[in-house]
Regions:
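Aromatic-lined, polymer-binding surfaces characteristic
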Residues: 51-229
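Carbohydrate-active enzyme catalytic cores, enriched for enzymes
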Residues: 232-348
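Charged, amphipathic alpha-helical segments
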Residues: 39-46, 342-349, 414-417
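Non-catalytic interaction/regulatory modules that flank or connect domains
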Residues: 313-403
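Extended repeat-based interaction scaffolds and adjacent low-complexity, acidic/S/T/P-biased segments
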Residues: 387-638
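Bacterial Sec-dependent N-terminal signal peptides
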Residues: 1-22
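Mature N-terminal, pre-catalytic/accessory segment of carbohydrate-active enzymes
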Residues: 19-51, 628, 634-638
Length: 638
């Protein structure tokens, strides 16, 4: 009887979802209804297969568009919701009680990765907000039952505060569920989570910093809160969080190339990191093509367009030679730097974040070639230099190599590199970095590789004092004793010099031409200049890799003489390296002063930084010496 009354409450209150605000939410127009309809046709076909070929969470994304476009009949919508309902874990004794399976064949009551309920509600609650009046009585009843369990599933799933995209998604879900079903206590649960999270980022920054995927997910949840909440306190908090995030994104963004620069915490594309953030939000916001085919994304984009960029954010995006320093965690030494010039930017992180981060990167972009393969360093043990392991299905092909006692969440089928110890010291357009790693459970070889991915767009390339051509397909050019590589792109010069490594004496780094061409798969865009090269050093067969490098970029290289001067600066710079008892002390004498690090790679301790321009004190998000993060978020410290 109690359960009947609760369901009746859901049914009656759900019909009037958000009616207390006294307005009906405007539904934005889709940019290409024909493309949207084609997507609906494909997804409907996938959903009807047995088993369904549409992921459970994507059914909610699908139904939002179905109801907007009136694509299905009422009975078909009921069928789809009841199909999803079979994936809800309703056993109160199950580990994942209230959650939803990701697919259609799992059983046992344990979903493993508990994030699915968060995504399902993030998408699906728009049905209640926008189209509740288009549901049949039976469809509404089914959806309300799903969300009744979902609230339990959300509460049952532990989430660490540093798991930014899911934590912020939970905030949105709690606020939306509480408001839709007129449960103020649930809204207050969301408010409390919001307060805790704002305090955390006010002190330590955004841990999932500058991710082309997950900054987009963060924006979605914050934009939805800002658009739909009827609580002025929560709306103000969302506005402040959005301002902080958009300051960050604008500082790193390359509008000409349509991509997010800087070091990346999580980047599923090792060679060119454009993803959800750029394709669905930033590029359409900035006047690029809007290829959104789902109303969910269009709702979020329309709110972002309504907010727009502030004058400060526009100026940040256009400012040349800006230097950004940002904190990204409560742990010591967790910060990243980015120097953004006109045609080049160079970025470093002082600590690894994840097995799919991009801690050392250079981005080139000009009017002639706005977008191309990025330059990125990776240390890995799969021979997966370009990060294609997942796309090529190598996890399945190499499953016979899975080690004994492999962790259940190890990500064998995913693209993975090491999470090594690292330390870096960056002074605008140059940095010195040290990386030390050991073979882990995702490696398939006894040795590790240090690789730098390069675009095949250079006007000239040099190894040491020898100008060379790009190696023929399948060939390589071996480094000489200078251990240096320089290249020129228009008026930009770049250099890499290996300062110290543990490779065998007969093992030299080399420039390889594998004939690699990148074809986007996660997002639908075309990259014309998609060819890549790589510099790779193979480390010893003991599974240990150690390397220190000096990366340098410079613009304004107008002549051969300018480039010769740049190269000689790199070759002739005094380098001092001392190694003793696992401690490496290395310094490069640059024209600006000493640049380097001192590291205890055995005990994984950062002992000292040498930098002619020390980092600002007590920074959160600092651009050119001005702190722009704390003025927004300091009021949320508790």
């Amino acid at each position: 009887m109690i359960r009947y009354v609760f369901i009746l409450f859901l049914l009656t209150s759900g019909v009037a979802a958000f009616a207390q605000s006294g307005k009906k939410h405007q539904i934005p127009q889709m940019p290409n209804p024909i493309a949207r309809n084609a997507t609906l046709e494909q997804q409907w076909k996938s959903l009807q297969q047995s088993p369904s070929q549409l992921a459970v969470r994507d059914v909610f994304l699908f139904l939002v568009d179905v109801l907007d476009a009136k694509f299905l009949k009422a009975g078909q919508v009921e069928w789809a919701l009841k199909l999803v309902q079979t994936r809800v874990i309703t056993d109160p004794t199950a580990p994942s009680y209230g959650n939803m399976y990701w697919g259609w064949s799992e059983t046992g009551g344990d979903v493993g990765d508990g994030n699915n309920v968060e995504f399902c509600v993030q998408y699906g609650i728009l049905i209640k907000l926008l189209f509740d009046d288009r549901l049949s009585v039976e469809a509404r009843k089914t959806l309300d039952q799903i969300f009744e369990y979902a609230l339990k599933g959300i509460r049952n799933q532990p989430i660490r505060i540093s798991y930014t995209n899911i934590y912020v998604m939970r905030i949105w879900n709690m606020i939306a569920l509480g408001q839709v079903y007129k449960q103020p206590s649930v809204v207050d649960e969301g408010r409390k989570l919001f307060d805790i999270w704002l305090n955390h980022i006010a002190r330590y920054g955004n841990r999932e910093y500058d991710s082309p995927t997950y900054c987009g997910v963060d924006l979605e949840s914050l934009l939805l809160i800002h658009r739909f909440t009827s609580d002025s306190d929560i709306k103000t908090k969302a506005a402040d969080a959005l301002r902080f995030f958009m300051n960050d994104i604008s500082s790193h963004y390359n509008q000409r190339g349509g991509f997010l620069g800087g070091a990346h915490s999580r980047d599923y594309n090792r060679v060119f990191g454009r993803d959800l953030l750029e394709e669905k939000y930033m590029n359409p916001l900035l006047g690029g093509e809007n290829r959104n085919t789902h109303l969910f994304h269009q709702v979020c984009l329309s709110e972002l367009q309504k907010l727009g960029l502030t004058p400060q954010q526009k100026e940040l995006m256009d400012r040349k030679n800006r230097f950004i320093v940002q904190r990204w965690d409560s742990l010591a030494n967790t910060y990243a730097c980015d120097f953004v010039g006109n045609k080049v930017s160079i970025a470093s992180s002082n600590q690894t974040y994840s097995p799919d981060d991009k801690p050392f990167a250079i981005y080139l972009s000009s009017t002639r070639i706005p977008e191309m393969i990025n330059i990125a360093f990776v240390m890995e043990g799969r021979g997966d230099h370009y990060g294609t392991w997942s796309y090529e299905g190598m996890g399945e092909k190499m499953k016979h190599l899975i080690p004994v006692n492999y962790p259940s969440n190890g990500g064998w089928g995913k693209t993975r590199h090491l999470m090594p110890f690292m330390q870096s010291s960056q002074n605008k357009g140059e940095f010195v970095m040290l990386v030390s790693g050991e073979k882990d459970h995702n490696c398939i070889y006894n040795y590790l590789n240090s690789t730098i991915i390069l675009p095949n767009t250079f006007d000239e390339i040099w190894i040491g004092n020898s100008k060379i051509q790009v190696p023929a397909l399948g060939e390589k050019a071996i480094f000489d004793d200078t251990n240096a590589f320089t290249a020129r792109f228009e008026d930009v010069a770049i250099a890499f010099r290996i300062l110290w490594d543990n490779a065998r004496k007969d093992s030299k780094a080399a420039l390889y031409n594998d004939g690699f061409k990148y074809n986007p798969s996660r997002e639908a865009f075309h990259l014309e200049h998609n060819e890549a090269l790589r510099l790779t050093l193979r480390h010893p067969d003991n599974g240990i890799a150690r390397i220190a490098m000096w990366w340098k970029v410079q613009e304004g290289i107008k002549s051969d003489a300018d480039f010769q001067k740049f190269r000689q600066t790199v070759f002739k710079a005094q380098v001092v390296v001392n190694e003793e008892n696992g401690i490496v002390d290395l310094v490069v004498s640059t024209p600006s002063g000493k640049l380097g690090v001192k590291s205890d790679f055995v005990n994984k301790k950062r002992l000292e930084y040498y930098n002619p321009a020390p980092l600002p004190d007590n920074f959160l998000f600092n651009v050119d010496g001005l702190e722009i993060g704390k003025p927004i978020l300091d009021k949320y410290k508790r």
